[in-house]
Every structure is written in C-alpha cells, then in structure tokens.
Amino acid sequence: MNEERLQWRTNPAIIAQYFTGEDLPKDIDIHLKPNEACVVIEDGKITGIATAQRLTVNPKLGTLSRILSKREPFRSFLFVHTGPHEVLVKLDGRWSDGTEGKGAAGLKIRFNNDDLGRLLSFAADGKTSITLGDIASSMELEISQKFRSAHMGTTHPSSAKEDRDTATLLESGLRSISQTALTDIGAQLDRVWLSWIPSDHERVMGMRSELEVLAEHGRLIAARDNEMM
C-alpha cells in the first residue's frame, strides 16, 4: 500500500476510521486535510493527536531498539473528519393536547481535536468504521426522551408549528439537550433546526439508511483494495 492509495475515508457517511498497526504498512505517509486529524494510541494510551497535513504513521522499530531487544508498542490509529457534519435525529412523543407528534431535527456539529479520544468508545464496541448513523444512534434515544419530557408534553402542536416564539424556545431546548449528549462523544453543536412535517420524520430514516448502504459499500471496496496491495 502506498500513500496515494490509502484512503481512510471512503465516502461521506464515514466520519471516523479505526486501524490497528497490523492493518497498515510500516512507515506509511498519509495526507490529512485541514479538517482531519489522527489520534495515535500506543499500548492503549493516547500519545498524540496529529493535525499536520502530512505525517508518517506506524514507524518501524529503530535498529538500536532492536539490538536492545525493546518491544515494539501495540499501535492503533483513529482518523477523524472533524466536520462540520449534519446529524439527523428523529423526534416523537405526545403534545400537550394528547395528540401524537413526529418530527425531525438536524444538528450541525463538529468534533473538538482535544476530545477526539472519546470516539474510541465506538472502536471498543467493535465499530471500526464510524458513520453519521452511528453518531445519531448513540444519542438519539437520550435526545428524544428528554425533549419529549421537557418540551413536547407542555406545548400545543399548533404553537410548535405556527408560532415563531414557541419554535425558537423549542430549538433552544433542543440545543441544550443535544449539547449535553454531544459532549460525551467529544463534539460541539453549531446550530439546530426542527421540522414537524411528518414526511421529514420518515425522510430522516430513509436518508440514514441510504448513507449506511453507502458506508458499507465503501467498506467493501476498501477491503478489496487492501487485499490487492
């Protein structure tokens, strides 16, 4: 494998990719875009976060170290596209009048370089390719439950859909709830939007499914390319 053929991000659905040192050739040069970073882990501990446009990863053990019989550390690498990204979250619950409400929320987020290590929780659970769908799934339940309890149950549907002041209050509430959930994965929230059009709720799920299919397609292509190198 050479630097020109190594593409850690195979499609827009993937926002982070985890590799062990065994997955990569020794002393490989990798180019990072301005909004990409690489978390370097040695023997289970983060030793650095690289943001340079070009870096060499997975270095060979030096001659002196080999002579002294030093053990090569177990290395792994987490590449991250820091954003911005738009995460789609479905919302559902009951309004103050008892009617059912379904909507969609869009969260424009970006990842903080200093907190990228928090994404390693996905790798610990066996997810080596982290997608926007994974990010949404990790916090959707928390956001939906808290928003339903704190805001939907005390709001009339007509006000949510037609009154600008009410809509602003709901967006503010969503922002507060979402930022708490995003902190757990090392991200910050730039802006939010809300829609109570029923079709948008279904569109969120459809778009997410399409992105996951693209992500899986990209993983298969990457695996095939790696086998050929």
Language-model features, listed with the residues they occupy:
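Assembly-interface segments of oligomeric complexes
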Residues: 209-229
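N-terminal, positively charged regions that mediate nucleic acid binding
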Residues: 1-50
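Short amphipathic alpha-helical patches
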Residues: 62, 171, 205-206, 216
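Detector for Asparagine
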Residues: 2, 11, 35, 58, ...
